[in-house]
Amino acid sequence: MILRTILTFSAVLAVGVASAAHTDAPPGRYDYTAKVAAAGAAGKAAATKSNEPEEALALADRTYAYVAKALGEAALKDEKAELEADRTWLAAAKTERARKTVEKEIRRLRRRILFRHPDLQFKKLLAVQRGIPYSRENHMVDQYLGRWSRPGPGLVVLENWQTAPKKSSLLGGKLPTGTVINPDLHWNADRILFSFCDHTAKPPADAQKLKVPEVIVRDDPWVKKVDPAHPIYGPGYKAGGERAVAHRRYFIYECAADGSWVRQVTGCPGDPMETQGGRQTAMIEDIDPCYLPDGGFVFSSTRGQNYGRCHWGRYVPSFLLYRADAGGKNIRQLSFGEANEWEPAVMNDGRIAYTRWDYINRHAVWFQSLWATRPDGTAVSHVYGNYSEDIGVVTETKAIPGSRLLLCTASAHHNITSGSLFLLDPSVGEDGLKPVTRVTPEVPFPESEGWNTPGAYCSPFPVNDTLFLCPYSDETLGYPDYHPRHRREEYMAAWPSPAAFGIWLVDTLGGRELIYQDPEISTFNPIPLVKRPMPPALVSTLPPPDKAPDTGLCYVENVYDCRSELPKDSIKCLRINKLDVMGACRRETLNQHDDLDLHKESLGTVPVAADGSAQFRIPAGVPIQLQAVDTNGVAVFTMRSFIYAQKGEVQGCTGCHENKFKSGAAKYAVQSPAGRTTYDPKPEVDLGYTGPFSFTKSVQPIFDRHCISCHGLGEGRRPAFSLVGTNGVYNLIKRKQISFVASYRETRESKPYDYFAAASPLWKKVKRGHGGAKLSKEELQTLALWMDLNVTEFTVGGGYSWNRPESRDADPAGETALRAAVREALGEKVAAQPFDALVNRGMEERSRVLWLVKPEDRDRFLRLVKASLKPKPAQDILGTCGRDDACECNSCWIRRGGYNDPKRLQPTKIR
């Protein structure tokens, strides 16, 4: 018998109810016997003490059968004899005390039997020790920024891990104080990739003069003990205030599995530090490195210089997928989303699984789903969760050895990555709970099944399809108030303790065995230090870079092959919309009606053939949305996600959001089908400008010409509301004249004619000539396009920036001069009209006053119109506002500080 005291609890999964087992909790830790939970959404439940010994015996029986299947019963004859003796002992036990004594022995025997399994016979276990990241906002993306990192010992090795784990530092002080996250062990078990944040790196000399977004630093007991000179506590921190750690960031490093060498791979000499579009609006940070079978590696990075739209000006740049050759050479962008795409992992077929946050005209919280791509960035496809709200964040995906199953963590949008574990079978379905098997039903799926529930798993590693190594904490990883800025002290007090997470062995039999719990700091990312089979290396299907066009080719076999039934023969064309990413930290109101709306630019339409097929080109390297458009020029069906193409890529699908389990998997080919004509998008109307659609430039002139004489200027019958200027949009929405997708009030998935022009009373009115207005075909199509793009308002000439021309104020002196000239030319009545009835703030040439004056006076009045508007405060510089000390975009400090300048890099000092 094993006499050592162990900490363990079991869950009886067969009946779907978790129950507590005996526990001897270490001093200062929670008593796990008081923590039990019902499966799924039921959450916590009281322990049933009367049947715990019988449950322990049933678990031991299942464990014996499982291990005996692998080893043979002869190898376990001694354990079988002990199990039968314990069964007899339990039957004879009469008192609760006696039954508890037997239960303890049964659980010890069960642990010993389990550890006999051949897949658990490795000698060493790799892990990471670090503090738990935190920020002023409890959000899933903040944790990956170095500024919020908490230091720790880093990479450690646990020897004798089954019985009495002995911890040792892998790198033995080769790296300075800092934080290691998300290591990846090569299949040959000879080297390790990991992300590291160097806490000894210094900010630029003039950093305190820069307008740097605020950072809050909490007291850290581990740092205080081992590094009292750390900036958290030193005079430098007090002098520098909260900005002292804002420069910290993660880069990628590689080391030998035996710790004999370590090197920096990114953020060091040789890294060109190139960013998308040359923007300099976010510090480059690299995380989530993952080896590829072709010799390179994939990782997530802020090199795309994007931001999510719902962070309210916080410094939270998006991470997108990149790849590099061995040693960090030839870095290339793989994904082009507008929000985060992260946590890449190689599946058994050689493709890369990753998590995508996707809220294109849909809820910003519930859709962090699982996607896959080939290692060259082609053939992007949905794996699970794009239509489902059952699991909010599907992440930390790992392929099960020798299986089609994937091990995933169901995590929360408003928390660090942790939650409940489940197995996913993509062959069963791509949404809902049918393809999901819960591994830890005692922990609810965070947010979708409950908020602030106790217990959380994270960074799991599958030993096989039954056994999983995984950190676990019984603490509540949440905060009392939904928005912590209002009750920050309470929020901070509720944050997990430094040693919240320890390593456990979790199994689908119903058992939970503690492997290692450090009393001072949390332990994450357990990985057996053994070789594993390498997945196949997928050869790139792309043309050589010097021969690749700047476009990709897409084809659709049949737009009518759809989850929702589309009206027969209704689709005339596909509209190709380019999604405009938010390239800076700070932005003003995006739209009056929806502050989280995404800006879009219609590139034009491509025809759909009679058989429902279409083949067309799209620009490479940008996110694209598709809309199926009918013969009236209005959207029938709208994609609420996006596609993108690599240069020279050929990609295809069966239909519009087709069910691949009904129609077969989405097609992928190196060449397009023969005999089809390939079209380039043709603009529906000539907007007269490039970039995202602008209400002020395109729709206001239509209202000015046909509507405001009644709706705003008081001519004829007094109207119920005004359409003068952008207030007209608000008035139309208030009176439910236009149908749009409002953030946090969206339907879960697209349906035919559900929103936009076709569902808007305004569209029906202008079509039938409301009020005698006779709009041209081009004007009608412009209105339809505006509504189909979700009633976009402010975009062009700065996009999400505060620096857009549509937001320019009137210049008092210039307005006075303009009105004087109007009074002389057109009379007092016109001169007294609202400023927005005379001047178009976004495009002066389309100002209404220019239509009213004589042709020979237009040039003079155009000069007066331009003088009546204040100039934009500044011109953008590499994506920033360029105002430096008077910065309004919260990003100028990146450029001024030279954070992405390869000549100013500070490589980590490796000993």
Locate each region found by the language model.
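Aromatic- and Gly/Pro-enriched helix-to-coil junctions and flexible linker segments
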Residues: A21-K44, T48-N51, R62, L83-R108, ...
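Residue-level detector of Asp-centered blade-edge/turn motifs that repeat once per structural unit
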Residues: L120-Q121, W187-N188, L292-D294, M347-D349, ...
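Beta-rich catalytic cores
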Residues: Q121, P151, T179-I181, N188, ...
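Short, conserved, GDST-rich strand-edge loop motifs in beta-rich repeat architectures
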Residues: K123, A127-R150, S195-F251, T275-G277, ...
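Conserved beta-strand position repeated across blades of beta-propeller domains
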Residues: L126, D184, C290, S335, ...
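A short loop-to-beta-strand structural motif that recurs across blades of beta-propeller domains
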Residues: G154-V156, F251-Y253, L320-Y322, S369-W371, ...
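Multi-bladed beta-propeller domains
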Residues: T163-G178, A257-M283, D325-A339, R374-V393, ...
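Loop/turn-rich, solvent-exposed surfaces of beta-rich toroidal or solenoidal domains
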Residues: T355, T395-W504
